[in-house]
Regions:
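Flexible, compositionally biased loop and terminal segments
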Residues: 1-254
Length: 254
């Protein structure tokens, strides 16, 4: 039943309403390794292909009017993968940023990073700081790359920070509202996610943006991330526009 409801494959390019574009889209870029395995390639080739697709999707998202695109680049759980693959992923992230930050800057894309960056190498931290500094005044789409990110970890860190603020008298417990908590998260500059996209057939959120996904619409596809295209993105947006977002309320006819 889930497959019948949620699996979508790109067909002809769908029409979308330019006045109803989701402001904040999140993507779990899944399936790189499986994509490579099906082609008899090493997993590293899948990750490289996925990095190339991200560049194209960022520009496509900006063109259709999405304001923020948050992508899952490396999770807190990914450290459990084989050391060789972790090293490859870190090298690929550095390579991606070194080769693409200037391109993104030229296309007016702002780059931000969410997650516990302090656990990454000094070299990668510098690349991250430089990318954010270079693009900080850009006014197009904001690309948020989640690196060493976990939704539970984010919430725990936020609780600690709020607790410290109460202890030092900066705030009282009465100040702790949903809006205040949102303002303390890594994603504090942006509204909650409107649309979550996950390729590669899995129906789970994998500890991604747990707070921010509270009322998001979910869209799944059998396609692996390296096969994702602008047309796939448009199909996801078109499906989103057909949904009735109720935020806990009733349907119009109920």
């Amino acid at each position: 039943m889930l497959k019948k409801l949620f699996n979508r494959k790109p067909s002809d390019t769908p029409d979308i309403d330019s006045n109803a574009i989701p402001k904040h889209v999140a993507i779990i870029m899944d399936g790189n390794g499986r994509w490579a395995k099906r082609r008899g390639m090493p997993r590293s080739m899948g990750h490289r292909a996925g990095a190339d697709v991200l560049k194209q999707i960022v520009i496509a998202a900006d063109e259709i009017g999405i304001r923020a695109l948050t992508v899952y680049g490396f999770s807190t759980e990914n450290w459990k993968r084989p050391e060789q693959e972790v090293s490859l992923l870190m090298a690929l992230i550095k390579e991606y940023l070194n080769y693409n930050v200037k391109y993104m800057h030229e296309h007016n894309v702002r780059i931000r990073f969410i997650g516990y960056i302090g656990a990454l190498s000094e070299e990668l931290q510098k690349i991250i700081r430089d990318a954010e500094l270079l693009t900080q005044n850009n006014t197009g789409l904001t690309l948020q790359l989640a690196l060493n990110y976990g939704g539970r970890d984010e919430i725990v860190r936020t609780i600690r920070n709020i607790t410290n603020s109460v202890v030092d008298g900066s705030i009282t417990t009465d100040d702790i509202t949903e809006d205040y908590v949102s303002s303390q998260l890594f994603t504090k500059e942006f509204s909650d996610v409107d649309l979550l996209i996950r390729p590669s057939s899995d129906f789970r959120i994998s500890n991604f943006l747990l707070w921010q996904l509270a009322y998001a619409e979910f869209w799944f596809t059998d396609l692996h991330w390296p096969d994702f295209t602008k047309e796939t993105l448009l199909e996801a947006v078109a499906a989103y526009q057909k949904r009735e977002r109720r935020f806990g309320g009733l349907r119009d006819e109920e």
